[in-house]
Amino acid sequence: MLFNFYNKTSAACKSLPAKALSNVRYFQTSPISRKMPLPPVLESRRPKESPEFDYSTLSNYKSFKVKHSQLDVSVDFKKKTISGSVSYEIEKVKKDENTIKLDTSYLKISKVKVDDEDDVKFKLLERKHPLGAQLIVSPSSLPEIFHLCLQFSTTADCTALQWLDEHQTSGKPYVFSQLEAIHARSLFTCFDTPSVKSTYLANIKSELPVVFSGIQTGYDDSTKVYSFKQEVPIPAYLIGIASGDLASADIGPRSKVYVEPYRLKDAQWEFDGDVEKFITTAEDIIFKYEWGTYDILVNPNSYPYGGMESPNMTFATPTLIAHDKSNIDVIAHELAHSWSGNLVTNCSWDHFWLNEGWTVYLERRITGAIHGEATRHFSSLIGWNDLEGSISAMQNPERFSCLVQNLKDGTDPDNAFSTVPYEKGSNLLFYLENLLGGKEVFDPFIKHYFTKFARQSLDTWQFLDALFEFFHDKREILESVDWQTWLFTPGMPPKPKLITDLADDVYALANKWIASAQKFTEREQFEKEFSIKDISEFSSNQIVLLLDTLVQGGMPEKDTFKWSNYPEASEIFTDIYEDKISKSQNAEVIFRNYRLQVKSHITSSYPELAEWLGTVGRMKFVRPGYRLLNEVDRELAIKTFHRFRDSYHPICKSLVKQDLGI
């Protein structure tokens, strides 16, 4: 059957369908006309060309325009492979270029075809970590516009996919992809850079339902082939494929949720009604949603991220299902990517903040518009705490806590991944909003920016040029910004002025507990002073801030206070607030409760945290969870990791190994 399928799909090597090509829309970056140069600190660092070259790809992508792409693949759960062909319609930019250099990583390449030339010569160079193995295609001739087709198969070393057996799911095998940042090259041969965007068609054969980063156009029950289209040009890292025992339900007029059947009712309840509200609010802030549908795939427990912004089909962690809608702001984040990241994209991972900083900023604008400005500021407070924790835990903060990164030496972008581009980036935009005159002044720039760079990839200097160009009448204000600190200096950024209405009661309660821990010696004293009523009206996010503030020693932070000196007080805290904290089903609360207990050296919590780490795959919890265990019981941390390592995504597994030094 697989051989017959290959015969069927290899027809894509002959030519791409005329119908598909009629939908092709290619947008090339337009040069920006600058009336005046930027301040010297920015001009001195300006790259020779914009968008800046992407050093995280081995391809010669600057020589070509990819106008359309097509995937024709088969999912084989027994062999744990995805195989088939990828076809490109390409236009030469450099007329004298006669070889095509592509990205691969742990792929088998069986055949290459250019137009009517079968069995084109190709050479797969030796793999060099982390960028993979360069594929050099050498056709006898290369016309100005040509079709390239490559037949391939993934291997057991593939870093783009996680295969789950029946015992890791509700009973049937499952596979999902995670391609950001440079793992698309491990799924299919490509120009694996966010600088290259194209439209896509996909035909995917699988014995189980399939979802893809596009709109489904058909399903052939006789061949088990699912067909999709993506008419908005996207880079390879945004491709998303998943297949498994999936059911779906409506959660809005243009949205569905896909999930394993046993979770369908809970997932539908969690998201129903809120997604459309997010979409319409985002449309008011930016402009009309361009992708048609917005669906959500809730993956099994091992999914490593909170979400991945695959167009039309957000991939999400099951930790969002908190049974109280308290974590659905993650969906506001992934939805915001429909504009920042997916429509307007960083040209390389050095400028990742253009994706994530804008997205966090827009996410909080969306939730602030729905729930009030105080909610927006409160989310920023929690984000600030996350940023402090992320930077303090970094092994190389001097390098990786700068907003604009430097990965030109071939460093793995995954190693640079942190909350810095998210929180430092969003804080910069929030700072600019207030500096320039507030939302009323800044909002027209939002629409201008996303209109100007729609369907393009850009670098930080293009953002800055657009900013200075738009606010030409406020140049003196923009020149007063400490750009060196914001963009190029490691460490925390300047702290924003935030509305603390929702935080003040939290800070007061945290400080009261810390004072009492140092004063009280008997449980009865605590029980007289505190009760569950203290937090009965707190939202989950307020409880998160309470636990964060307790761990950091109060507000303002007291470095001299250590919970390890007051373990009894910590245990009493957990007992008094059991119904809202210990019994919570919100992973954000669960993790922070374990962190408080571990920091308090409550040894009974160590094996409990270890067991919990076997039930989640989200790196936001897994990585700091293992670091916590490693601080207090290295043997247990390593033993736990070896016990659960096969349940983690390859990216997660690799990074935890680094964290533990094994």
From Swiss-Prot:
GO terms for biological process: peptide catabolic process; proteolysis. Keywords: Cytoplasm, Hydrolase, Metal-binding, Metalloprotease, Nucleus, Protease, Zinc. Zn(2+) binds at residues 333, 337, 356. It catalyses: an epoxide + H2O = an ethanediol. Its cofactor is Zn(2+). Binds 1 zinc ion per subunit. This is Leucine aminopeptidase 2. It comes from Kluyveromyces lactis (strain ATCC 8585 / CBS 2359 / DSM 70799 / NBRC 1267 / NRRL Y-1140 / WM37) (Yeast).
